[in-house]
Each structure stands twice: as C-alpha cells, then as structure tokens.
Amino acid sequence: SELLAALHTAEKLKDTTRHCYTSGGRHESVAEHSWRIALMAFFLRDEFPEADMDKVTRMCLIHDLGECFTGDIPAFGKTAQDESTEEALLYQWVASLPSPCREEMRTLYDEMAALETQEAQIYKALDKLEAVISHNESDISTWEDHEYDLQLTYGEQNVAFSPYLTALRQ
C-alpha cells in the first residue's frame, strides 16, 4: 500500500546517523533527533498558548524526511547545492504520497521554508535548540575543534523571538 511504502521510506531515518553523539556514546539517528524535537514541542505547548502546537509537532516530525534520500549533512558543512538536492528529492517523494497527506506535507514544508509564521519559527528554534542540547549531553571528546565556538552561538538567532527559549538555550 501507499502508506506502507511511505513508512518504509521514513524508516530509513532510523539508520541515518547524525554528526552528534548521544550521551551513551553512539551516533544519534535522524529519527531520534526528530522524535526529541517533537517531544520538546509537546512539553513546551503551554509556553506558546497562541500557537498551533499540534502543527509545530507535525513540522518537527517531518522536518528531516529529506534526509531519507541524502543522508544527514551537518549544518556547518551543508551547501546551497546540498539543500537544493534534498528539497528536490523530498518534494518528488511528497508528490508520490496519497492525498490528503501530500497536500498537507507540501503546505507544511512551504510554511517551514518561509519561516514567517510563529509555528515555523518555533519548529526551527526547537530544531536548533535540540542540536545544542545534544552536543552538551555528549562527551566533549566527540566534538570537532570548530564546534567549541559554534556551540556558543548556534541557534541564537532562531530562539531570539522567545525569552523562554533564549533562556533554555543558555
């Protein structure tokens, strides 16, 4: 079925590792990162009573599905060409999904890319914030030299709209 095919594609994120290590010393998967930012959206729903936090949670769950096709490329190494390739492959896959999922995902991805709504801004802030938290939880011996400086500022602009998220990032 179309549903099983879509789930099979998404299952690839379980085996797609990210740059960051877990506190247990192994590489984190993209699926784990997506799960945790969705959990963060659930935990923080009362911090943003005017926002549609169910939509934020959906954004968090789907935000890295493009990495099913390209793998994870760390933010510090991702080029405009990498982003373009990932987006093209993702949108091609989304177009193959059954309706109404196809339309909802396309709408969510467009909103996430524009970063104009509060929901998109919250999702993006949580995405960056989770990466900072994950790095802080991992053994510092797993860090690359350039990450020490990057960790000091990564995601600051994304959380600046929210005093709560700014404080959490500190």
Functional labels for PLM-detected ranges:
Residues S1-Q170:
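Active-site helical microenvironments for divalent-metal-assisted chemistry
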